[in-house]
């Protein structure tokens, strides 16, 4: 059996040596075909980046709505109520701004993928993109509940293995030109280690 395997390897090596020119196929060509390199002229005028306030308010209510009939932790209910109260005061905090940015991208059909050690909750408990019910730990992800036609939203708490996770997301980003792919360092020296 070992000899058969060695013979097969030798045969393949002999075949490979007979090929004079290797053909390299760009496997990402198809997903990037609608894009081109930027030109100097592209930066003369800034693109429109604003979002309609009425639509932002609708999205804010949507991403801060927790489906009824489930038992949530009081702390989570207060957080979501406080977020809705922010809308009335016309003052948003960083977390709400971040969630709204994701919501607008998703609403416009772009995908968003976030990974990192503590991204579902947010390192300092600011995000709570994933909420777990108190009684059975069912996961509720409001950013997945915006509309039937929204972009795909994925969020993953990863292992404390920066090289592997960042490497995976770097490759994932190459294959997802219409998506926002984020690897989030928790805090401290994790970012430097991954670099």
Where are these regions (language model features)?
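Flexible, glycine-rich loop/tail regions that form catalytic "lids" or insertion modules at the edges
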Residues: 1-195
């Amino acid at each position: 059996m070992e000899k058969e395997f060695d013979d097969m390897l030798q045969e393949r090596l002999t075949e490979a040596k007979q090929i004079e020119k290797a053909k390299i196929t760009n496997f990402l060509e198809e997903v990037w075909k609608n894009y081109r390199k930027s030109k100097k002229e592209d930066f003369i005028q800034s693109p429109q980046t604003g979002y309609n306030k009425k639509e932002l308010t609708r999205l804010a209510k949507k991403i801060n709505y927790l489906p009824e009939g489930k038992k949530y932790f009081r702390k989570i209910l207060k957080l979501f109520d406080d977020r809705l109260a922010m809308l009335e005061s016309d003052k948003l905090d960083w977390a709400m701004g971040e969630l709204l940015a994701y919501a607008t991208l998703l609403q416009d059909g772009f995908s968003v993928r976030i990974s990192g050690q503590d991204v579902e909750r947010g390192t300092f408990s600011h995000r709570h993109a994933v909420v777990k019910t108190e009684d059975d730990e069912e996961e509720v992800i409001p950013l997945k509940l915006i509309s039937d036609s929204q972009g795909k939203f994925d969020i993953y708490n990863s292992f404390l293995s920066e090289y592997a996770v960042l490497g995976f997301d770097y490759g994932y980003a190459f294959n997802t030109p219409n998506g926002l792919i984020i690897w989030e360092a928790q805090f401290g020296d994790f970012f430097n280690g991954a670099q």
